[in-house]
Amino acid sequence: MNCEQRRLCPFGLVLEAHFPGQDVRDLNVEELRGLLRQEQLLVLRGFKTFTSAEDLSHYCEQWGEIGLWPFGKVLERVERDNPEDHIFDNNYVPLHWDGMYRPQVPEYQIFHCLSAPASGQGGRTTFANTELALKNASPELRELWQSVTGTYER
């Protein structure tokens, strides 16, 4: 893979561009899929990316069929003052899964940040690895979790 690789803890991998202007589309999607299956999370930093939502959706189609939402293929999330939906404000959103209202679980979710914080400053999105949580939980905790059910309502 023509980029720098750095492990995240406790899971995931950061892929950083080798040079300014390196285009994310030049990375082999099959190799990225393999890394994603192995690492569960890929963060790509410093790459030239997309000029429009349509450009992003064309790239995502290389990964597989795109699930359609009421808003289309790409949610352009921009913080707003007094938004109608909490997802567009800049307040904390409790731990959730972005596909929680969908009947099918997508194989991949791709997020694209137009204005990311500097390296080392972190971001505002928390990613969790359920497999690791289950592996590291005590038998008592796993038993407790098995008794919990939930329903998403909007």
Give each language-model segment a name.
Residues 1-154:
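Non-heme Fe(II) oxygenase catalytic core, chiefly the N-lobe of the double-stranded beta-helix
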